């Protein structure tokens, strides 16, 4: 059956080729039409293209080519559930490929593309209507890997874990779940960061409708969903995007630019159709799956050639990132765009400058590295590393930072968080409570990887479930309870989030006492004021003094040595001081304490 409806799409296709489109998924791939599907594939340099699948009895059907716009097309009596493949012919070479715009595919075996039902009906209107970028709201992100959060054998479906995940997230007072990539990928140990299907939900976790339902159910329970997407590179498998039309269609032809350090292939954003392809991918996931945020992986490898600052800024990529973020911000103004960027490139979260990349948030890798380094050092030598704690606030207001303790820090012999702490078994738990208090009360939004909340002693392994049984040990159960309560205090007190990016929201009270490694600071918002005291050394203080020039009452809200967390400080303190008096606190070794600061009339009320 010959249908020539494609002629009506030429303006859209021209926009796509020129890099101006974010709706490529509505133009290419399998498009429903009458009782079947139209298949369109952009491959300008291919000599011929064939399609075969369940609907052709796996016989080759030749596709027509529009030579002016460089795409192939065909109508087939295909239906939902049919698998298919493309055969691309160039200079006599016949190569089977997956459809770049396939919505699903087989991740193993014969890597065929799959036609799926795309008419899922969401029930999350209220949540989507009220969501925001959370600049002045609490955002405490729980990062998970679908396949190993709770593993039931070889493969885990989204819907296998969703009910238990919701219970855990709500109980722990997290606000969002961030999901490591679920775009289709062939090599499981890549964790999804080397993809072959930029519009396909990985079949190892279910079909697209399963993921949509997963997001929908989370939204109905008040939980936001952020997805990791990869824009810097794609998998090196021959059947994916690699030399798709017999030429370097998606990648650079120049030696030194094609391959990344991981052996994957870098996207070439000097090409208009590549820009449109990736903008369309981002738009597809946001629009079709109701995502609340996208975390863009390895941004530093886009900013600089293969992430090497000595090779200079990659101007084509800079322009693309800025264009991508402007496009998405206009189409989806309440969806967050988050950069995982380890570079010192400026203006990552700036939307006004020509050089600004336009992200909403940037991971603070400097804070993460400095903090971990500090806690790895022996307590008695920490005075020499004092600036590892103080330095973050020197640059914090340059960007809109998010504080991550992510999967990258607990894998490949880097050790789990508990084993990064210096000292013996007992003192590691004490220090990890201090570190988490520091993270949750420091300005900036928060992220923790699954397992951090129970102080697991295991490095993360994508082939194994988190060892939840460890909570049967009192010390881990106590730690988990502390994290839950700490998260609750963060979530319910505006001082800890409303003014994250306003310099008036933070003030050091004790910042220069390197000899004792005691730090103290206030967090403030309208009608909300707190004092955070952190003893980061194995040193007891019978009466550590803080000068205040006000009549105040200090009401302790959480202390890491409370008996409910395995400690022996029985009563939370309430201390009243008059103007000119000092606040005097007993501080135990590795103690974290958070006080609400009230004036007398506030206490009375």
What does each model-found stretch correspond to?
Residues 41, 86, 144, 169, ...:
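Conserved, mostly hydrophobic/aromatic
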Residues 45-47, 150, 537-540:
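Short, acidic/polar linear motifs in exposed loop/turn regions
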Residues 1-38, 58-143, 148-153, 160, ...:
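The feature marks proteins involved in alpha-glucan
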Residues 128-136, 145-291, 295-313, 585:
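Substrate-binding/active-site clefts of carbohydrate-active enzymes
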Residues 290-292, 304-463, 491-561:
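Conserved alpha/beta catalytic core and glycan-binding cleft of carbohydrate-active enzymes
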Residues 80-84, 571-605:
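C-terminal beta-strand-rich structural cap/linker in extracellular carbohydrate-active enzymes
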Residues 475-496:
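Catalytic cores of secreted or luminal carbohydrate-active enzymes
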Residues 42-49, 56-58, 549-552:
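Short proline/glycine-enriched turn/loop motifs at strand-loop junctions of beta-rich domains
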């Amino acid at each position: 059956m010959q249908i020539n409806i494609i002629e009506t799409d030429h303006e859209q296709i021209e926009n796509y080729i020129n890099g101006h489109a974010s709706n490529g998924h509505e133009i290419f791939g399998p498009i429903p039409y009458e009782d079947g599907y139209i298949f369109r594939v952009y491959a300008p340099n291919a000599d011929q293209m064939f399609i075969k699948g369940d609907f052709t009895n796996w016989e080759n059907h030749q596709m027509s080519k529009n030579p002016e716009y460089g795409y192939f097309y065909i109508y087939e009596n295909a239906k939902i559930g049919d698998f298919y493949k493309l055969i691309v012919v160039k200079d006599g070479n016949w190569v089977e490929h997956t459809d770049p715009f396939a919505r699903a595919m087989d991740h193993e075996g014969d890597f065929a593309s799959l036609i799926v039902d795309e008419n899922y009906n969401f029930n999350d209107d209220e949540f989507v209507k009220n969501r925001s970028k959370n600049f002045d709201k609490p955002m405490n992100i729980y990062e998970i890997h679908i396949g190993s959060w709770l593993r039931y054998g070889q493969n885990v479906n989204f819907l296998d874990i969703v009910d238990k995940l919701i219970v855990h997230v709500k109980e722990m007072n997290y606000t969002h779940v961030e999901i490591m990539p679920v775009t289709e990928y062939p090599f499981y140990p890549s964790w999804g960061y080397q993809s072959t299907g930029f519009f396909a939900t990985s079949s190892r976790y279910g079909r697209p409708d399963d993921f949509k339902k997963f997001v929908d159910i989370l939204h109905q329970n008040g939980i936001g969903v952020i997805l990791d997407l990869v824009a810097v590179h794609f998998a090196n498998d021959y059947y994916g995007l690699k030399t798709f039309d017999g030429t370097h269609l998606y990648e650079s032809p120049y030696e030194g630019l094609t391959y990344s350090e991981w052996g994957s292939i870098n996207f070439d954003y000097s090409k208009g159709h590549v820009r449109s392809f990736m903008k369309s991918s981002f738009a597809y996931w946001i629009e079709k799956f109701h995502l609340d945020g996208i975390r863009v992986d390895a941004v530093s490898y886009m900013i600089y050639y293969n992430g090497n600052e000595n090779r200079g800024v990659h101007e084509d990529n800079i322009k693309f990132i800025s264009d991508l973020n402007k496009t998405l911000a206009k189409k989806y103004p309440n969806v967050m765009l988050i950069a995982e960027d380890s570079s010192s490139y400026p203006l990552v979260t700036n939307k006004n400058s020509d050089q600004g990349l336009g992200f909403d948030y940037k991971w603070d890798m400097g804070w993460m590295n400095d903090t971990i380094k500090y806690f790895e050092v022996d307590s008695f030598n920490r005075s020499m590393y004092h600036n590892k704690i103080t330095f973050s606030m020197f640059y914090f207001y340059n960007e809109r930072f998010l504080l991550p303790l992510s999967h990258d820090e607990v894998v490949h012999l880097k050790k789990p968080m508990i084993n990064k702490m210096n000292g013996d078994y007992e003192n590691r738990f004490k220090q990890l409570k201090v570190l988490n208090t520091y993270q949750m009360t420091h300005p900036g939004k928060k992220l923790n990887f699954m397992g951090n909340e129970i102080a697991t002693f295991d490095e993360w392994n994508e082939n194994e479930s988190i060892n939840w049984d460890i909570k049967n040990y009192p010390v881990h159960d106590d730690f988990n309870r502390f994290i839950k309560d700490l998260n609750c205090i963060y979530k319910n007190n505006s001082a800890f989030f409303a003014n994250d990016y306003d310099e008036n929201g933070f003030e050091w009270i004790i910042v220069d006492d390197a000899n004792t490694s005691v730090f103290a600071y206030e967090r403030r918002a309208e009608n909300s004021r707190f004092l955070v005291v952190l003893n980061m050394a194995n040193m007891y203080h019978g009466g550590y003094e803080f000068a205040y020039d006000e009549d105040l009452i200090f009401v302790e809200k959480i202390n890491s040595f409370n008996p409910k967390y395995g400690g022996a400080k029985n009563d939370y303190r309430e201390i009243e001081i008059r103007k000119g008096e000092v606040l005097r606190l007993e501080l135990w070794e590795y103690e974290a304490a958070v006080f609400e600061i009230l004036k007398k009339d506030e206490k009375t009320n």
